[in-house]
Amino acid sequence: MRTIQHLVIPGGAIYGLSYYGSLKYLCQNNAFQMHNIKTIHSTSVGSIISTILALKFEWSEMDNYFINRPWHEVFKFSLCSIVKCFKNNGFFDISTIKDIFLPLFSAKDIPIDITMKEFYEATGVELHFFTIDVSNFSLVDINYESYPEWTVVESVYASSCAPVLFQPFKKNGSWYTDGGILANCPIKQLCESKINPKLDEIISITTEDRVGDTNKTYDKYNLLQYVFDLLSKIVNKIQPTYTPDKEFSRYEVIISQSLIPVYDVFSIVNSPQQRKILIDHGAELSRDCCSKILERNIDIIDSIV
């Protein structure tokens, strides 16, 4: 019987919590087990989620971390941060990613400056983070083989530094920005890589149409919501509107982003209740995918018997 060995986790800002909720539901209902996972391909917030999953905490511990941590102390919005945004091309810098990971890394006795190669050796999970080299607007796959000496924090930040919200990542004379513009869901990159996975070894999470309702009103948008809605429309012109791609993925969870505006960071960092709603949203949308995987396993067992 084939087991799920590869996960694909996309970008999607606050909906990273829904991706986490989806994978928690699938794992707890025996669709896959983390100890069988060999690779995780991810972009933007998906890179944050994949790093945390690779640490293999108990689900109850991760629930407590995501829901009850005082996130407003990590993402601090103030007049000072607004001024810095104009000066430094973004509200937050790499120190925010360090703050996200520090308590988790410390709990596992992992140094915050651990390299990609060291992290692979410690966890056994091959992480692939996708970012964009701004100079030539090319997609870059950061992994332990291609960038072994980059730290995990640097690699995740390069993949996650969405324009305006985060400052671009600068290293070795190059600037990097959020990989979601060119590969928001890097399932194609996984399937066309040397890994050459079987279709029934992959669980892919993706999002439905990123543009959303064309009749929406902008009257109540804040700056971040306006900028990222505009970016979503640009991305949609670069990448075709999403349709399920059975050529690349047999087991897929499609996360609707209609529950809360995708870049409503302000309300999410201040509300444990809203964070739990997003996690439960992901779990609810995973039921069909879970049933497909379990039915497949039953059919295989029946055929063997």
Residue positions per predicted region:
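Patatin-like phospholipase
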Residues: 1-43, 51-305
